[in-house]
Amino acid sequence: MTELRTPTVDLLPGYVDALTRGWTPDHIVGPAAAAEQLATIEADAAGFVARQTNLSAIGDPVTLPDGSKVQRIPGRQYWIWDDGFCGRLSLRWQAGTAALPPHVLGHVGYAVVAWKRRRGHATQAVRLVLPYARAQGLPYVEVTTDPDNLASRKVITANGGVLIEAFTKPAAFGNTPGLRFRIPL
């Protein structure tokens, strides 16, 4: 059964195994993101885990794929789990508003390891995070995907997502086409 787990040091070996097997939590940056995270974990595993939940947006600015830096917003990471690590899901928001800054493409993002795809883990993970998003005061969550990512589109629509726009991603994300969906809460 698919679960969302708060990252802990005890669960970290499953995450590290996925990174060493070629999975990356960031499809835009790719393998460099995995290498960076492995180095961070090796240097300070407990600190890495602690930073996966950042409800107060504390810390250094976030570096975007193009190298530009932006302020953090509140968020938390979950690890998708079903008899081991399956992927990660992130939830981001700003207090008091559903609006997101232009550099944040959606409230929810997820990535499932290749060897556990097509089992419904992403669909269930998104479903499981929606009550937490509602508890943050959000009336809806926005999720974006590439137009050709049919699997992600199915995940979003299975959770009630409605297409609200086709758009061009900001320069920091390559000025590529994207689709923005909204899931009402």
Question: Language model features by range: what are they?
Answer:
Residues V143-R153:
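Conserved beta-strand-loop-alpha-helix junction that forms the acyl-donor binding cleft
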Residues R117-R118, D148:
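Glycine-/small-residue-rich active-site loops that bind phosphorylated ligands and cofactors
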Residues H107, Y140, A151:
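Amphipathic alpha-helical recognition patches that constitute DNA-binding helices
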Residues D10, G14, A125, A151:
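Charged catalytic carboxylate motif
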